[in-house]
Amino acid sequence: MADYIYTMEIRLTPDQSKGVNLVQEVARAAGITLYLTGGAIRDIISGFTIRDLDFTVQGNPLKLQKELEHAGATIAAADDDLKTLYLLLPGNVRAEISTARIERYEKVGKPPIISPATIIEDLRRRDFTVNAMALSLNPGSRGLLMDPFNGAADIEAKLIRVLHNYAFVEDPSRLIRAARFAARFHWPIEERTLARIESAKENNYIEYITDRAIGQEIEQLAYEDDPLHIVRVLEKEDWLKVLNPHWSTAKVDAAGLGQLIKTRQQMNQLGYTPDPSPAVLYFLTARLGDKDIADMRKLIPRKDLVAAWKDLEDNAKDLAKRLTGKEAATPSRTWKLLSEARQEMVLFLEVTAKQQAVAQKIKNFFGKWRQVQQKLPLLEMTELRITPQMPEYPKIAHDVFMLLLDGKLHSRTEILKFLKPLAPPPPPPPPPPPKRGRAAKAAAGAAHPAAVVAPAMGKKKSKGAPVSPLPQPAVKAEVAKAPDPPKAAKHTSPKKAAPEKRTASGKKKAKGKKAKRR
């Protein structure tokens, strides 16, 4: 179990990982069983780019709207019939939360009858084996992979295999989906699945496709890494005209779409992550009529995507106007304007800008000016103790960068002149080393004068201030007489010791004076 959790954690982007944790915590607090399902599991196992997060709950996800919004998610749309929430999680992460359900089709082309189900029953209603897997995100079973149709084996074999015989009858949009997956992954369609597709074409089941399914397929084109290739494959299979009868590759701005993909890759390398989906739809439908575009927009379930697509040109024109005005009169002001603008607008404007001044400023923003950013005077800043540990460091570094952009700092002298007032005060000098020997004793005596009073008691008092004697300990009434100090021995030639005399009692008697008590 832990292996799939580990694989998930290393395959998700940091923002996607945060999104999984956000949904997981909300579901856990509500006591709802949660699974990561569908395309997300397929892409985690296969190694393809994880485009969005698909969650399935055993319960009603519509009841989680307030909690999800409070946690930071944006509700892009809600489908009451399918009990599905379309979310935009922090970091522009797309996600869906659907209820585990059974779909029973009573008639071709009619919406299914929906009823609650377990996660295994939910997996049985899906389209292809590679999409019929679920990963538990619940305590006690977290990391458990449910794969009742051996989808992991088909991923390893790189095959598109339908789940059951009536898959294309129940939901004709799966015909378009099969072609889209085969084109995206460059995987072949399994033989029996291919035979069922041909049978569905002969019976013209595609005419029963619902508007909801058409809208979902149009939306999915916006998220493809190579949408032009997908559109060409759909046109070859006669599926593109199903999405719109007037749509063809001739209506696509192929050059603009190619430049968009290239520019997005360049922005990704610089650390930017713009969402290209509104611009992708713009170029895919560049030569379609206004009515056709309006009809397509009505069918797309994510209304935030529709709004972004609709406002794309107007917002780009507004940004271009600001780039040619006083707000962008200097390089530093232009940098500030483009840094604060929506990344999607900058991406789209770089591809579509017609004014040379606008195009050049965006080009400088991603090119020449970033080279200036690499020339911050780090040596001078370090000399003045202006380091990243300072709370003010980001602002100081930004201010220096702005001055460098505008050409106001040239020499080392100018740089130091600007930085010195911003430098922190020098640190205090280090404490002196500890004193040793007589100096240490003298210092100790100065610190504790009472300790040196006693030795001075026997000496004459100095003419200075009198020193109070230390209190003496109480003396006992009878004190043994202290022995006299021994006399210093004279340095004479050694003499023979006199023989000792003994008394009658046998005790030795010292010759001469009475022996001193030692």
Spans of features found by a protein language model:
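Catalytic cores of the polymerase beta-like nucleotidyltransferase superfamily
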Residues: 1-518
